[in-house]
Amino acid sequence: MNNKTEMGSSTSGNCSSVSTTGLANSGSESDLRQRDLIDERKRKRKQSNRESARRSRMRKQKHLDDLTAQVTHLRKENAQIVAGIAVTTQHYVTIEAENDILRAQVLELNHRLQSLNEIVDFVESSSSGFGMETGQGLFDGGLFDGVMNPMNLGFYNQPIMASASTAGDVFNC
């Protein structure tokens, strides 16, 4: 735009060229002011972008720190859960071993009960024929006095002892 104005002024003469140059100078000054204004805006925008990038980096760093703290917390929580599972598993194994022992005791006691019931049935069915002629009962010096004497039944009151390893080997549970 300045070139056209200067061309037109150079064809018209010296006087008009001075006034045109003055206009051109004032145009240059406004252009300079405009450029300065644009440069100032660019500087402000760059500074604003730098601040925005800094804030963004800070947000990202804070987010990373938060995630790192969360990972640490979750790992600690996971370790506690794993430890709890180990304790629970140990309790389970212990209780299972105790249950195996109790099952073995139940089997033995059922066997003893069955044997005693068979003896009682035999004694009741046989009581009419043995010892009646002599006046002796079966339990007062008669045939079964040695078997049914409470003093001879002491071994029945002994606790059944089984170890966890033998119970596991026997039952394979």
Swiss-Prot record:
GO biological process, one term: seed germination
Tissue: Expressed in the micropylar endosperm and radicle tip in early germinating seeds.
Gene3D superfamilies for this protein: 1.20.5.170
Subcellular location: Nucleus
The keyword Protein biosynthesis appears for this protein: no
Record-level Gene Ontology MF annotations: DNA-binding transcription factor activity; protein heterodimerization activity; sequence-specific DNA binding; transcription cis-regulatory region binding
Transmembrane segments: none
GO CC annotations on file: nucleus
Keyword vocabulary terms for this entry: DNA-binding, Nucleus, Transcription, Transcription regulation
InterPro entries: bZIP (IPR004827), bZIP_plant_GBF1 (IPR045314), bZIP_sf (IPR046347)
Segments for region (Basic motif): 41-62
Positions of the bZIP domain: 39-102
Inactivation phenotype: No visible phenotype under normal growth conditions, but seeds have decreased germination speed after imbibition, without affecting overall germination rate.
Biased composition (Basic and acidic residues): 30-41
Compositionally biased tracts (Low complexity): 8-22
SMART domains for the chain: BRLZ (SM00338)
Matches recorded under Pfam families: bZIP_1
Renumbered residue ranges of the record's region Leucine-zipper: 67-81
Chain residue ranges for the region called Disordered: 1-65
Function, as annotated: Transcription factor that binds to the DNA G-box motif 5'-CACGTG-3' of MAN7 promoter. Involved in the positive regulation of seed germination through MAN7 gene activation. MAN7 is required for both, loosening of the micropylar endosperm, and rupture of the seed coat in germinating seeds.
Assembly information from the UniProt record: Forms heterodimers with BZIP1, BZIP9, BZIP10, BZIP25 and BZIP63.
Name of the protein in question: bZIP transcription factor 44
Organism of derivation: Arabidopsis thaliana
Taxonomic lineage from the root: Eukaryota, Viridiplantae, Streptophyta, Embryophyta, Tracheophyta
